[in-house]
Amino acid sequence: MPRLVSHPDEVKVISRRFGTGAADIEKYLEQDGYKATRQAIEKGPEWILAEMKASGLRGRGGAGFPTGMKWSFVPKVSAKPKYVLVNGDESEPGTCKDHVLFLEDPHAVIEGTMIAGLAVGAKTGFIYLRGEYRYLLNIMEKAVADAYAKGFLGKNIFGKPGVDFDIITQTGAGAYEVGEESALMESLEGKRGVPRIRPPFPAVVGLYGGPTVINNAETIANAPHILLMGGEAYAKLGTERNGGTRLFGISGHVERPGVYELPMGYSLRKAIYDVAGGIPNGKKLKAVVPGGASCPILTADEIDVGLDFDQMAKAGTMLGSGGIVVLDETVSIVEFALRTIRFYQHESCGWCIPCREGTDWIKKTLTRFHAGGGNKKDIDNIQYLAENMMGRTFCPLGDAAAMPTLGFVKKFRKEFEDYIEGTRVEHPLIQIQPVGEPELAGAH
């Protein structure tokens, strides 16, 4: 988990309360806490939706779908209860932004959940944390309990008759797969966490069969800030089709790893060299994973690109979940590829044959390759397997495993060939430094 740090280029909107003790409800109230919810109650659902659409906010979990539009898909009238589901199952390797949000500003997540509920007519919200974040559950549960004690949750919230909203917290059991929204609903319903066939989509038939809004934790926590500052003002912080700011967790070989809030469209090069301080020990940049492990890798020559959904797509990769992993010249791409596919093979739910068998065969081939027993046909087979996984699974996990694999093979083929010819450079193992829980809470 990177440290909480700061840089002059940051535009602090969602992170403005970080380091201020805002997990305490009194501290949160001193900083405009729950003010946006009061406004939302007074002005109504149509106003909320208009501001969210004007903000240009796009989903911060990776898909990048416009949030205001997503909320507007929920039918106004439903025979079944409506729900809001916050996806806090942050499990993408290299991603850690939501962790900081839950730790530093849990009430923003609660307030955003309430605002989404008011916008779509839901009376119940669920906040789902990944299994490995179980120690954050105490923080969220205390924040929820404090909100109930203040009359901000439950019946007649803020003293408004008929305005009711409840929040339930839940943790997973450590499966990456349940970060996919339909698998998340299955898990929350007590079933095996595997994806559903769609359509129907969650906005119409979701949790327990009712219309459901599902948003990433960072996405939902932006809602109160947007209502307070105005959707248009928020949009102007970013680019034309990518409104606002975003939390980026910059890790790997940089001088100042940490979670930073940068405007959408900010230069990836500047994020690495200015914000995060560049590559330590005089080493050269080799490659960057720009948005979490599922995003195709960029070489050192490809980092003059803006950090937004559209510019990343033009560069042949994705903004993903905001986890920027920087690799210096000492990193073996073959080893990095093996570590990446090991994760996806382990986390595949096994539901779809292309994902289940494809990840396993790629892992086996890369393992043999890394041990020095590969050949040129293996390189072609790895690419062939990855290409035939693309678009052939119920959920995006198959693509998430295939896309980075294709990037490794296509952009660093010579490095793979060096393993065959015995000319490879010996690289030190990538060291993973564990950070204890007490250090996390105090790392300001």
Give, region by region, the residue ranges found by the protein language model:
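Ferredoxin-type iron-sulfur electron-transfer modules in oxidoreductases and energy-metabolism complexes
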Residues: 35-54, 80-84, 88, 97-102, ...
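Short amphipathic, charge-patterned alpha-helical segments
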Residues: 112-116, 263-281
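Histidine-anchored nucleotide/phosphate-binding helix
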Residues: 105-119
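Conserved phosphate/anionic-ligand binding catalytic regions in large, soluble enzymes, centered on
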Residues: 52-74, 116, 174-186, 190-192, ...
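Gly-rich Lys/Arg/Thr-decorated short loops/hinges at beta-loop-alpha junctions or inter-strand turns
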Residues: 28-35, 86-98, 202-207, 249-254
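Cofactor-/ligand-binding subdomain signature composed of acidic, glycine-rich
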Residues: 1-49
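Short acidic, glycine/serine/threonine-rich loops at helix termini
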Residues: 63-64, 68-71, 95-98, 137-142, ...
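Hydrophobic alpha-helical positions that pack around
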Residues: 137-264, 276
